[in-house]
Amino acid sequence: MSKAIVLVAFGSANLDGIKKSIGLLEKDLDSYFGEEYTTFKAFTSNKIIDLLKERYDYVVPHLSKVLFNLVNQGYEEVIIQPLHIMSGRDKNQIEEIVNEYKYSMKKLVISKALFTDEDDKLNKESYEVGNIISENIGNNDILLVGHGSKTSSNKLYDVIEKAVREITHKKVYMATLEGKKTIDTVIESLLRDEVNNLIVKPLFIIPGKHVVSDISTGDGSWIEMLKEKNINVTINENSLLQYEGIRKLYIRNINEVIKK
């Protein structure tokens, strides 16, 4: 019986970032599951799919196209692994697409996102991820950076911030590109707390343009704003998928779905 694992993200037009994040997970899955499962990747943003094709002649198909092809090629078991930091609108979109094919295969299931929205599980997951990303902190306090949302709750970021603070015993702050946790508000807290040395750790699954343009380089970047306040700043530009420990969490999640 032909079996597949499909990694699904909204998408990124950062080709190098794709290769350094999803590409690493693909290699790990091939090593771990390769004898039984073939690994594919898919995006759900047609705009990003078109940009990648136009700029780099690099094709990442839409999830619906991948599933259509797998059905036609006779695949009977498919595990969908969302590459979203948390369940939400993106996962709902994946579920809508998957439901169109659920009667075309013997087994078509969706594995869980990196974080769930159940409080008990979220606390445990935050400590797992917090331990992984808290490596190599040195003599620095910590600024975590997330994408955030203008419309949804940022409870996830509050829980991660608390977990990293308890793990590292450092001053820990959280800023998001969208939402109320702005860099301006964080800078006020940093100055009030007399923070001198800071390491910036992004919480993105795929390193997109945000890490490069908004946070780390150019006029008006977060790093520039922090340095203007005489704060010594180091940035760790790793995406979450560049941590081996995070990739192992995904392998564990997929294993759990396979065994059900």
Label the model's feature ranges:
Residues 1-260:
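Extended amphipathic ligand-handling, pore-lining, and cofactor/metal-binding catalytic surfaces
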